């Protein structure tokens, strides 16, 4: 006699569970044109993640884009209390330096941060922020000025954790820089 056993359900934070999910991303919508940087344009943009409208800061270099598009850095900020988070503040010097070097920089607000929809429930004990970033990667792959084969990530603190998890989940991220 065969005795039925329960099939284990993977925890949503498990890498296998995260790899099994779909991250369709969406078109990137320019919500507002911001003051430009030294050699790049700055935009306040949005994309979709699990049906939520997520906002981001995006820079795009001036000039003629390379034949395959500009390389991309998805920039993952560290923990900032969601109630004081402002899209155009903090990490600006880092974003500026990367943008000046000829990269599209895409800094997501994560759900519940700034004007992004959803609840900010944390990046360590829940998969939500990583899901938002994986949808950002998928959205950047669709962006006409981006090179979908040259997407990297930069992350600080909690953003470093999100960067590492993202790189283990998808091979769409080719390189990562993690700051403690």
Positions of predicted regions on the chain:
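Short glycine-enriched nucleophile-adjacent loop
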Residues: 160-171
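Active-site loop->helix "elbow" adjoining a glycine-rich segment at hydrolase catalytic centers
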Residues: 129, 157-160
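Short amphipathic alpha-helix adjacent to the substrate-entry channel of hydrolases
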Residues: 87-107
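Alpha/beta-hydrolase active-site loop
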Residues: 123-144
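Short beta-strand element of the alpha/beta-hydrolase
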Residues: 68-78
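Alpha/beta-hydrolase fold nucleophile elbow
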Residues: 146-157
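N-terminal cap/lid segment of alpha/beta-hydrolase-fold proteins
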Residues: 22-68
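Ser/Thr-rich, Proline-interspersed low-complexity disordered segments
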Residues: 1-13
């Amino acid at each position: 006699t065969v005795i039925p056993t329960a099939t284990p359900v993977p925890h949503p934070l498990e890498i296998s569970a995260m790899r099994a999910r779909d991250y369709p991303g969406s078109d990137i919508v320019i919500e507002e044109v911001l003051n430009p940087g030294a050699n790049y344009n700055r935009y306040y943009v949005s994309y979709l993640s699990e049906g939520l409208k997520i906002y981001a800061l995006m820079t795009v270099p001036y000039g003629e884009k390379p034949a395959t598009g500009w390389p991309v850095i998805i920039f993952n900020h560290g923990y900032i209390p969601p109630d004081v988070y402002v899209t155009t503040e903090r990490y600006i010097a880092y974003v500026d330096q990367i943008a000046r070097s000829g990269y599209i920089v895409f800094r997501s607000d994560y759900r519940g941060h700034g004007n992004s929809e959803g609840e900010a429930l944390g990046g360590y004990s829940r998969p939500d922020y990583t899901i938002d970033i994986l949808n950002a990667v998928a959205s950047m792959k669709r962006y006409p000025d981006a090179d979908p084969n040259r997407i990297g990530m930069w992350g600080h603190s909690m953003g470093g954790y999100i960067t590492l998890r993202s790189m283990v989940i998808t091979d769409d991220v080719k390189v990562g820089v993690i700051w403690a």
